UniProtKB/Swiss-Prot annotation:
Pfam families found in the cross-reference section: UPF0181
Protein name: UPF0181 protein YoaH
Domain of life: Bacteria
NCBIfam families linked: PRK05114.1
Family as reported in the entry's similarity comment: Belongs to the UPF0181 family.
Gene name of this polypeptide: yoaH
InterPro entries in alphabetical order: UPF0181
Length: 59
């Protein structure tokens, strides 16, 4: 379970996707781009936060 994930509007999600695509077009790997944008979102987000739980289906 992860606490404190930013709750993003559709517009904010779209901007994040566009930022990831921009970084990838500059030669960054997808994983690095996602990690960088996630860090930027966490650092700059001032809205609500959600609690999310991810379960591994292989168990």
């Amino acid at each position: 379970m992860f606490a404190g994930l930013p709750s993003l509007s559709h517009e904010q999600q779209q901007k994040a996707v566009e930022r990831i695509q921009e970084l990838m077009s500059q030669g960054m790997s997808s994983g690095e781009a996602i990690a960088q944008v996630a860090g930027e979102l966490r650092a700059n987000h001032t809205g609500e936060r959600i609690v999310a739980r991810f379960e591994d289906e292989d168990e």
